Amino acid sequence: MGNNVVVLGAQWGDEGKGKIVDLLTERAKYVVRYQGGHNAGHTLVINGEKTVLHLIPSGILRENVTSIIGNGVVLSPAALMKEMKELEDRGIPVRERLLLSEACPLILDYHVALDNAREKARGAKAIGTTGRGIGPAYEDKVARRGLRVGDLFDKETFAEKLKEVMEYHNFQLVNYYKAEAVDYQKVLDDTMAVADILTSMVVDVSDLLDQARQRGDFVMFEGAQGTLLDIDHGTYPYVTSSNTTAGGVATGSGLGPRYVDYVLGILKAYSTRVGAGPFPTELFDETGEFLCKQGNEYGATTGRRRRTGWLDTVAVRRAVQLNSLSGFCLTKLDVLDGLKEVKLCVAYRMPDGREVTTTPLAADDWKGVEPIYETMPGWSESTFGVKDRSGLPQAALNYIKRIEELTGVPIDIISTGPDRTETMILRDPFDA
């Protein structure tokens, strides 16, 4: 039995994590975010009602669950307040259900200004960030000049630290990027206005999780973005600024690494990517357009059209290695309904003609990589909303089996629609 279950993206993000976390939290006592910030966009559909969460864990809609934002998350007070208000307006008592680590770095206005100034300066070489200040906030953390939630307990010292760090960043904004300086007094006033709300939710997360472990409570760790966007293991520099892989759970929450029991990789039945960066199986034809349209592939955070392509099992195998995945949840299988044939990328052909079955590491090494495909018959029957494996077409079952063979990991859950009821749980991670 696994008490501590991790749910993370096995591709480039947007795999459908929010729904699965929400589904599995039926049995959980805690749901923990451990990396990223409000650059995530987790969409939940419950009884036909849609909720998009960016920062607050997906367990917040359940009254039996305590949601925790761990130290690995960069926290925007403005984004948190906005999200809390939206939920509280719907009658959800967020403050009774949400806890924060005092070690969360704060994202403030100057981080957003820096993010946007840099993307503008990069021009055609822009990374395609969400423009929310995530990267600059992580930079401040590593440079040991960042302000944290815990700093809000001493308001005078906070004001002094803020003045110092803003002088540094405003100098860069004005003199290097030729952008406008950010107003110190406004940032201070805005942050002080919510300081007491934030500090009232602070808890020792590592201690809480250790006590939960000793009691045998079920805990869900909710990843954001996806494995192939990991700052260390992703397609650098076209990556996010945090560790999206399972290793980030321990460092981003304070749970001891030996206590992770099961890692569930969320795997879309095809591939998508937002922003720039390598994508060997990307489709520019009518099939790519079909996947985008059928899958409604537009970002929950930015509204940007996602790039679409066939499932890349070479890249997915890398995700298996990096995360020691226990099982997959296959999502959006129904998007492939109606295609005469479906393809799986099983290897890459390098520019020198070599065939390889592992991914390059640096983005430059992906140049000229061509996918080698295995083609399988598609299916015309609808898989949308099917709740039993026996109700799936044989061709869809063959596709699922082939993914398991190529990756060496069982598909434990199959999602056939956006609602939490449209799911087949073949093996529950908490029972595995």
UniProtKB/Swiss-Prot annotation:
InterPro entries for the chain: Adenylosuccin_syn_GTP-bd (IPR018220), Adenylosuccin_syn_Lys_AS (IPR033128), Adenylosuccinate_synth_dom1 (IPR042109), Adenylosuccinate_synth_dom2 (IPR042110), Adenylosuccinate_synth_dom3 (IPR042111), Adenylosuccinate_synthetase (IPR001114), P-loop_NTPase (IPR027417)
Catalytic activity: IMP + L-aspartate + GTP = N(6)-(1,2-dicarboxyethyl)-AMP + GDP + phosphate + 2 H(+)
Subcellular compartments: Cytoplasm
Cofactor binding remark: Binds 1 Mg(2+) ion per subunit.
Metal-binding is among the record's keywords: yes
GO BP: any one term: 'de novo' AMP biosynthetic process
Keywords, ordered alphabetically: Cytoplasm, GTP-binding, Ligase, Magnesium, Metal-binding, Nucleotide-binding, Purine biosynthesis
Entries under CDD domains matching the protein: AdSS
Binding site residues for GTP: 13-19, 41-43, 306, 332-334, 415-417
TM ranges: none
The EC number(s) this enzyme carries: 6.3.4.4
Gene3D superfamilies for this protein: Adenylosuccinate Synthetase, subunit A, domain 1 (3.40.440.10), Adenylosuccinate Synthetase, subunit A, domain 2 (1.10.300.10), Adenylosuccinate Synthetase, subunit A, domain 3 (3.90.170.10)
Binding residues for IMP: D14, E15, G16, K17, N39, A40, G41, H42, T130, R144, Q225, T240, R304
GO annotation, cellular component aspect: cytoplasm
Positions annotated to bind substrate: A300, T301, T302, G303, R304, R305, R306
UniProt key word Cytoplasm: yes
Subunit structure: Homodimer.
Function: Plays an important role in the de novo pathway of purine nucleotide biosynthesis. Catalyzes the first committed step in the biosynthesis of AMP from IMP.
Protein name in UniProt: Adenylosuccinate synthetase
Natural source organism: Salmonella paratyphi C (strain RKS4594)
Gene this chain is encoded by: purA
